[in-house]
Amino acid sequence: MRKVQISVRRLVEFVLRSGSIDNRMTNSDRALEGTKIHQLLQKEAGEEYVAEVSLKLERIVDGIAFSLDGRADGIINDQMIDEIKTTETPMEEITEDFRPLHWAQLICYGFMLAEKSDLAEVTLQLTYYQVSDKEVKQFQRVMSREDMGAFVDDLLSKYVIWAKASAAWEMKRNKTIQELTFPYDNYRSGQRELAIAVYRTVASEESLFCEAPTGIGKTMSTLFPGVKAMGEGKTDKLFYFTAKTITRQVAEDALDEMRRKGLAARSVTITAKDKICFLDERKCEPDHCQFARGYYDRLNEALFDMLQTEEAITRPIVESYARKYTLCPFELSLDVALFCDVIVCDYNYLFDPVVYLKRFFAEGPGKYTFLVDEVHNLVDRARSMYSATLKKSLVMQVKRGLDSKKNKRLLNAINAMNKEMIALSKKLKDLEKTIYVQKDELGDWNASVLKFTFVAKEWLPQNAQSESQADVLELYFESLRYVAIAEFYDERYVTQVTRSHGDLEIKQLCLDPAFLLSEKLKLGSSSVLFSATMRPIDYYTNVLGGQEDTSRMIFSSPFKQKNMHLLVADYISTKYQMRENSMEAVVDALYALASGKKGNYLFFFPSFLYLQKVYDLFKEKYPNIRSQKQETAMDEEQREHFLENFQAGNEESLVGFCVLGGVFSEGVDLRGERLVGAAVVGVGLAQLNHESDLIKDYYNETIGRGFDYAYQIPGMNKVLQAVGRVIRGESDCGVVLLIEERFSADRYRALFPAHWNHAKTVKSTDDISREVTGFWQNR
């Protein structure tokens, strides 16, 4: 007999959902108050109230053995079950039949309690808490065990077709996984060891931090053992998280390679809502978008069609079915993900506290494996995801657009926010500062933002045709994020108030996201965090939520060391105060590198301003070398054109001037003769700035390594990534020139990977020319 496990919430929502997508009605309760209100009401209910009770039910329907689980908010006197729902809807609009899905969930819990405690009937209590007015309204029903059982069986019978299809698919999938062998004839150096480590991590339900240099084949080395473990029941789903679209494509290719070897596995790639939306102006409301209108009424038919036909559900496949059934492509990709074995998506679908995949993670941990690629990017991304900003300019924009006679309540809320901002602006003026920082929250300001979200939530659906709708909605979502982040605020945060260019900005700045990331990683049963550059690995383990006993592995580069000639020009200082004086020496060193062999080169600089100055001098002094430079805010077409010029058969040399840490310093794959050399000017330190200094101060106070954590290590990682553009394959050869005296200092040499231990110091342009010429003559 087939066994199917499903939560009450998922069962109810899947079977009974109907109607349209409407962003104005988005359920922000969790973002607004989290579990605080639940805990408050549970505490006030008295000693007879037992809070957060786990319930389970085994039920056989149409040959399927269902295992139903859920968590009731409370049980009173062993025979009344309570379900708490927070809402911003005015209390007078909340009737007994306000949300039928709420009763459906409660009936399921009631039957589970009746079965567990052998009760003939159960009192069902639905408790609504109106967040803005802090009022409570309760409804009660008494239902017999028999009636509740019939209701649950009816739900399960409607889900049976999906359960049987999923069970049949799982059996087919597991059979192909058992027969699946590694898709390539041979393992690359280090690849088998990495695959074994990943498999053991998944099987033992642990975490692994791993540096796997370019060439090992880390995508296949993580996905293949993950798939094998899934076939043995050691994990239910694989999530492949990454920061870049191109890396998601690599994951898709690896899955396709396994499919060519016989694997049957469903995968979906989730594309960002703004990118995949069919509309010129995204507005997720039924009155505006035909793909949102009636979405849930058409969804299940589309899902069934897709699941009968597709395995590799990539963006084009999602778009095709979305158009066929007139469905929002973004929501369709999320809904089909519930039936997929592998989900390929951006970091934020796990780590972001607002946009994370609630259908997987809102109810607590699951038997999931998290494969997190390019984790060197996750540090800054995590700080950004757990920080939040509001600007006075947006508040005033909304205020100016509202009719004071028609929108008094909303304007009162906005005026309260503006009043707090005026007070903060005055404080800055009195202090004669443009930036003010404090460790504690701004309590009155936060309260005004929270109040605005309540009022705006009520105003938006009632004023759908208002010219101010878009502005209010923007401020509403920004405020929701701000309030959501306020829930995490602790000693790892500061509040920063900045006055700049006539605007006032209030920011909750996350200095250390490690604890928050570790909590997110606990939502899975196993995790592997990896990158080509994770040096020193203890730093990444510390800042990305690892523990002292978390496993760590560092693999050697699979490429021959002799294929990359590494030169360190430590006779030049590019420190900020020395740049004007050393600029000509930098230009001469770059020319010495590029003139040693006809070919294509990339030169990396710490800022656009410095890049422009060196570029201008280089063009003036060496006009015979063809050159191009990265521009600010290049679109995708411009970036592609920039890279298309790097061809193996170019008749003359080409040098590209790029920004370190920018779009061309990682994720760029110019193999063979398309790139024969690179230079990195400087050690990658960000310009001194207030936020980095706050991070430095925090880590100085906590572990005594402020400069390392805020400046040196992040900067050196940019260097490592840029150098990684040169050797992309086993037969690639190239020269790398590091220009900066600090590259010879012990604190930087300690961050060199093992395959850089052959670095050679050069003391002049003549040395560079001689080394470059000699290297190429010996190839």
Question: Model features per residue range: what roles?
Answer:
Residues 318-343, 354-361, 458-573, 581-582, ...:
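A contiguous, basic/glycine-rich beta-loop/short-helix subdomain that forms a polymer-engagement track
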Residues 168-211:
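Conserved pre-motif I regulatory segment
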